[in-house]
């Protein structure tokens, strides 16, 4: 069923033009045409326009056009080629994925009849406005002898009829129930008429034609914006599922392209016709800006190597506050750094050594910088890690409110005893497409429950603040042992497409939103990667004109959903949840980050994340928009509540006079605000220094950070421990019990220190120290954690690496244990890199 719909969408693709052997009127030959011809691939050739094709007048010519269109549309599957998999695979996968999640998404939408009727009315009025506007445009052009307006109205009407015929046929063929029918599952072949949406198809076909006829930014924004709003209203009104609207929107847009490309008279004006393939893929062989590329894992040796080069002044466009980076972006930075090192007569030997290893690792991507066919697949790593913990660690049950023994480890489970992970990672690219997967087996032993005093303290700092005075006390966590964990986990996995340096990915993805090494306040790898849809400007851009002073800029946005939240509070229903069972309706989380470099030595970034919707509050477009744009507050769980917002600001500055020796950086964070600049009394801070080399010891670097979530004065109505907590989402800023931000926690002060000696860019020995003090104003009697340890990593062959670490920890939380506790954590990891240093793929 999905495949057949994708073939219908192929009506707007190149198979039709290939069948005709022509480039549509108004088109210009693209570089991709020349490149394809040079490679021997069959492609369209230009011919002069047939004036008969421009007979755009009411009458038999319209009927003939529509018949030709329908013939081309329904015969297009026979002309599909292997190369069309570049767009069929992601579009088909996206549609199939949306169909699989349609029911869950629809369940999040408001069931209020008044709200649904409002959206239905909006979509009906909207489609009537499109139809009326199209007719009015034709009549106005006819009576004023404005041939351009007359053509625009006529072609828009033709496209609407074409797309309507296609979707009506598909409705009959698929018979899908609407969201309000039957058991609300949206079953196919059940006599319904939900798939696809005729409203969305007609709106997008008209918008597509009008946006080509009048290609200015404002007309396109109005046309496409109105079409998108109509489609969204059909979903919000529970008339269609999201996949219905997605497929019909694609059909409508492509049909509008096809009508315009065939019958537009270029002498009347309008925009240049460009096939959707050229619009999306630009050219072939592909240019780097259109090459799909996997992100480099956050625990890779590549980031410390590039950061050392940046601190030495050779990577001016590396954005440390927004990671991970794609492999292609790393290759671009390495290429630029190589040029700078070559041009610098005083470049240190350290820089050359780092570049040699990076050049070897990124040899395929460096070749692709000149353009190429990046059809490539790689088994990235196969690895196994054993971690032994003697003594009681701070682990599950204690991480959020007390602290944790192992930090920034993607939320992997651990307990006293022997812990094991074994897994592998790999990726594949083909043109603009990319897929990545990192799969692990994880094992952690069982553990006893925390004592009653600790469980009571957890109840007091998490749940009690939202219980009204005089109401029954909320439950404390049960005295239940923590079960052992033996599981397979897709730790990190996503699929995506890249266009013009914009990467669109969906799946579980790591994030690191700050320059610090201890873990950014806003988004770190302390919790497992969150399943999300992400839009990321993977390479920086520069604004035009006077705005160029902002320097290179990167932008990122995501929408995801959390797991493992147990409690939620509402001003309407009160506190609901359970300590033993996660909520069935987990909250959503969105966020954006923008970073800029006004100078090569100064980087700054701003970001916001918001938890919203979830149990008792349906996910709607209004709620989604409110989470992004609202700056006010409302009672928890009500229509006026924009969600649980957090804002961050970070910077990195290479200090004058000693730029190649000293870098200062900071990371400020605030809770329940959009920026720490609005109220520094509510802000927490990480401040750090980094020295990429020590005088007389060039292979040694040093880093120190101080951090706190314990501001000097906490003003009412904010209680102690309000960081990472919210009076609606009382399970906090967590995913499955792990803090998404910094390990410093809800109210604490701490420090982190590292000294690393680099034998080579990949072989090192490190000493580290970490200390945390939890305020007694937040946790009864407070608490402390002190870690000291060391680690080493070495590549014993070109494809095999070993790493190990030892950490001695003391912690003192009287509510957990009346005496100070100690534990020792030792870890050993073996990693096989099958493709390390090998070349892959083809380049031009």
Segments the model singles out, each with a brief description of its role:
Residues 17-57, 61, 275-417, 423-431, ...:
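N-terminal periplasmic/intermembrane-space "pro-region" immediately following the signal or transit peptide
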Residues 34-236:
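Hydrophobic alpha-helical bundle signature of multipass membrane enzymes
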Residues 262, 272-288, 594, 730-731, ...:
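Outer-membrane beta-barrel "beta-signal"
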């Amino acid at each position: 069923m999905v495949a057949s719909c994708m073939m219908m969408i192929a009506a707007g693709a190149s198979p039709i033009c290939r069948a005709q052997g022509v480039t549509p009127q108004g088109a210009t030959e693209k570089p991709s045409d020349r490149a394809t011809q040079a490679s021997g691939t069959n492609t369209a050739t230009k011919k002069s326009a047939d004036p008969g094709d421009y007979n755009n007048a009411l009458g038999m010519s319209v009927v003939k056009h529509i018949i030709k269109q329908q013939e081309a549309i329904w015969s297009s599957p026979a002309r599909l080629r292997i190369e069309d998999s570049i767009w069929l695979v992601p579009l088909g996968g996206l549609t199939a994925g949306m169909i699989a999640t349609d029911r869950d998404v629809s369940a999040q939408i408001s069931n209020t009849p008044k709200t649904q009727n409002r959206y239905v009315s909006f979509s009906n009025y909207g489609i009537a406005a499109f139809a009326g506007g199209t007719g009015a445009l034709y009549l106005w052009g006819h009576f004023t002898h404005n041939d351009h307006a007359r053509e625009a109205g006529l072609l828009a009407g033709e496209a609407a009829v074409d797309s309507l015929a296609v979707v009506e046929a598909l409705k009959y063929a698929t018979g899908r129930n609407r969201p309000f029918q039957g058991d609300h599952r949206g079953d196919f072949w059940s006599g319904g008429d939900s798939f696809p949406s005729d409203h969305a198809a007609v709106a997008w076909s008209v918008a597509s034609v009008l946006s080509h006829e009048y290609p200015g930014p404002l007309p396109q924004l109005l046309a496409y914006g109105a079409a998108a709003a109509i489609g969204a209203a059909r979903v919000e009104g529970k008339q269609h599922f999201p996949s219905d609207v997605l497929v019909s929107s694609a059909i409508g847009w492509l049909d509008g392209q096809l009508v315009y490309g065939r019958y537009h008279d270029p002498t009347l004006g309008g925009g240049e016709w460009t096939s959707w393939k050229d619009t999306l893929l630009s050219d072939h062989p592909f240019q780097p800006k259109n090459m799909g590329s996997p992100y480099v894992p956050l625990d890779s040796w590549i980031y410390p190597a590039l950061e050392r080069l940046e601190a030495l002044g050779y990577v001016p466009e590396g954005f440390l506050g927004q990671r991970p980076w794609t492999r292609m972006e790393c290759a671009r930075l390495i290429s630029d750094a190589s040029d700078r090192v070559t041009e610098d007569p005083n470049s240190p030997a350290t820089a050359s050594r780092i570049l040699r290893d990076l050049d070897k690792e990124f040899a395929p991507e460096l070749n692709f910088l000149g353009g190429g066919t990046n059809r490539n697949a790689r088994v990235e790593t196969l690895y196994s890690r054993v971690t032994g913990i003697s003594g009681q660690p701070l682990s599950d049950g204690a991480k959020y409110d007390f602290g944790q023994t192992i930090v920034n480890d993607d939320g992997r489970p651990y307990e006293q005893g022997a812990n094991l992970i074994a897994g592998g990672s790999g990726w594949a690219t083909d043109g603009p497409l990319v897929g990545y997967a990192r799969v692990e087996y994880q094992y952690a032993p069982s553990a006893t429950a925390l004592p009653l005093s600790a469980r009571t303290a957890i109840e007091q700092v998490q749940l009690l603040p939202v219980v009204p005075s005089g109401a029954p006390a909320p439950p404390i966590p049960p005295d239940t042992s923590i079960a052992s964990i033996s599981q397979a986990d897709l730790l990190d996995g996503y699929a995506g497409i890249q266009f013009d340096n914009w990467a669109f990915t969906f799946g579980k993805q790591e994030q690191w939103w700050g320059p610090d090494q201890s873990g950014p306040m806003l988004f770190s790898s302390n919790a497992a990667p969150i399943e999300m849809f992400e839009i990321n400007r993977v390479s920086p851009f520069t604004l035009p004109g006077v705005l160029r002073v902002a320097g290179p800029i990167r932008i990122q946005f995501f929408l995801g959903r959390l797991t493992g939240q147990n409690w939620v509070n509402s001003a309407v229903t009160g506190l609901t949840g359970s300590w033993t069972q996660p909520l069935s309706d987990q909250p959503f989380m969105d966020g954006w980050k923008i970073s800029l470099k006004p100078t090569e030595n100064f980087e700054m970034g701003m970001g916001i994340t918001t938890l919203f919707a979830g149990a008792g509050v349906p996910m709607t477009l209004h709620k989604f928009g409110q989470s992004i744009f609202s700056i006010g507050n409302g009672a928890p769980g009500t229509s006026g509540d924009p969600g649980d917002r957090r804002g961050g600001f970070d910077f990195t500055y290479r200090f004058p006079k000693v730029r190649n020796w000293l870098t200062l950086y900071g990371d400020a964070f605030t809770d329940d605000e959009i920026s720490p600049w609005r109220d520094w009394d509510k802000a927490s801070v990480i401040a750090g220094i980094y020295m990429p080399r020590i005088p007389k010891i060039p292979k040694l670097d040093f880093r120190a950070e101080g951090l706190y979530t314990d501001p000097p004065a906490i003003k009412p109505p904010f209680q102690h421990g309000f960081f990472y907590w919210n009076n609606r989402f009382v399970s906090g800023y967590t995913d499955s019990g792990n803090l998404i931000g910094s390990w410093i926690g809800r109210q604490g002060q701490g420090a982190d220190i590292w000294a690393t000696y680099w034998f080579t860019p990949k072989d090192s020995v490190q000493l580290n120290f970490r200390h945390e003090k939890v305020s007694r104003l937040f946790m009864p009697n407070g608490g402390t954690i002190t870690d000291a340890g060391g680690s080493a990593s070495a590549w014993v062959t070109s494809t095999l690496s070993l790493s190990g670490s030892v950490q001695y920890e003391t912690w003192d939380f009287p509510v957990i244990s009346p005496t100070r506790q100690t534990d020792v954590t030792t870890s050993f990891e073996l990693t096989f890199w099958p493709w390390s240093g090998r070349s892959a793929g083809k380049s031009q």
